[in-house]
Amino acid sequence: MNFFMEKNKDAGHRVTIKIPKTTVNNSLFQEFIKIRKTTKINGFRKGKTPIRVIQEKYGSAIYYDIFKKLMQKFFYEFLKTEKIKIIGSPKFYIHQDEDKKKEYFEYSVIYELYPQFQIKDIKQIKVNKINVEITEEDIKKNIETNKNKKNIWNPVNKAVKSYDRVTINYCIYEKNKKIKKFDKDNISFIVSKNTLIPQLNYKIINHFVNDIIFFKIKFHAFHPEKELQNKDITFKIKIIKIEKKQELESEKSNKKNITEKKTIQTDYQTIKNNLHSQINIITDKYLENQIIQKIVEKNILLLPPLLFQKEIKNLYKQYTKQYQEENSNILEKKYHMSLDSEVKKRLYFQIIIEQIILNNKLFADENNIQKLIKKISSNYKNPMEIIKLYNKNKNLKNTMKNIELERQAMLLLKKSIKIEKQNWNFERFLNYNWASHEELMV
């Protein structure tokens, strides 16, 4: 196979490939023979039609299909030979065969390379590892907080304050024209403690029942509701009800008998274990985010536009599917946020981890994968069903393999960098704004 590589200023990378005419003609002939065996043409017995007749009848369509397959075959052989990793879908261009004497056909392919990346000064990176101390008093408070309590919401004739429960009706307008399909009634939420857009929370404060509030927001280009994308939308909100919370201990929690004390003693260790597990997950993620962020700061990592756009589309599909499955509200905050920062985080993590795997020639340890499967399956009612599913499902096997490789790569990174320990008490951990840390990760 002959090929010529070049780099275009605007169009990415290009390779010109030559396919011998004998290869094309042989492939065409084999296809004509297949058609002759399976197709009956008037005037000829099945399997006896002359190749010339089949060529006249089907030649153009078959030639295009054969050449398309050969172009893809030779291009991917070129990628394998040159050990090139591409992103996105390559674009194929057939050259005009002006010189009939040539012994080959020419075509070009434009493609985008997966980013080349070398990690430097890894030993100079410093990050913080948070160790959270949980005292007996912390666990007792947690048990007390989660005891059976009955929340009573009492209607009040007062201005809305934070942590009140508010019920609203709303409708929306674009350029003073109402979009009726998005009308919603009796939407209840706790002010300053919800997943809705911030504008709603601060606009509603200090208002009363029957007050009507207007505010305008620009919907994001990737909002799941296509009809609202990139549009300036005005919300008209009417407050229907304002309620304040009153906590009452249930009758069960008032009966401090011996059985309950035994239950609390049993729950103590379970709650302690659960708290440690949840804290470890959050602090490990915090540590890993710092590592990726520091590597990006010290090393130039350019994300190819094709790769970025591809990941944007994938994330948008996920968000849209989730939005539809959960029958979400258009006021949900996460659907009004830019996808760019989340996509950057994902791609930085993916590229860095893949580079670590490549540099260190890591391979998935089957014993560790089996341990992971057993751990995951233990969370289900029928663990054996999950294990059977894993053994049958190739996609699930690949997912588990990637998780194991990521674990090994991250472990290597943690061993290579400088980690400074920070000791926190449980209260500091609870009060830390973890969401803001995630938002700053770019």
From Swiss-Prot:
Keywords: Cell cycle, Cell division, Chaperone, Cytoplasm, Isomerase, Rotamase. It catalyses: [protein]-peptidylproline (omega=180) = [protein]-peptidylproline (omega=0). Its EC number is 5.2.1.8. InterPro entries: PPIase_dom_sf, Trig_fac, Trigger_fac_C, Trigger_fac_C_sf, Trigger_fac_ribosome-bd_bac, Trigger_fac_ribosome-bd_sf, Trigger_fact/SurA_dom_sf. Coiled coil: none annotated. Involved in protein export. Acts as a chaperone by maintaining the newly synthesized protein in an open conformation. Functions as a peptidyl-prolyl cis-trans isomerase. HAMAP family: Trigger_factor_Tig (MF_00303). Consists of 3 domains; the N-terminus binds the ribosome, the middle domain has PPIase activity, while the C-terminus has intrinsic chaperone activity on its own. This is Trigger factor. It comes from Buchnera aphidicola subsp. Acyrthosiphon pisum (strain Tuc7). The lineage of its organism: Bacteria, Pseudomonadati, Pseudomonadota, Gammaproteobacteria, Enterobacterales.
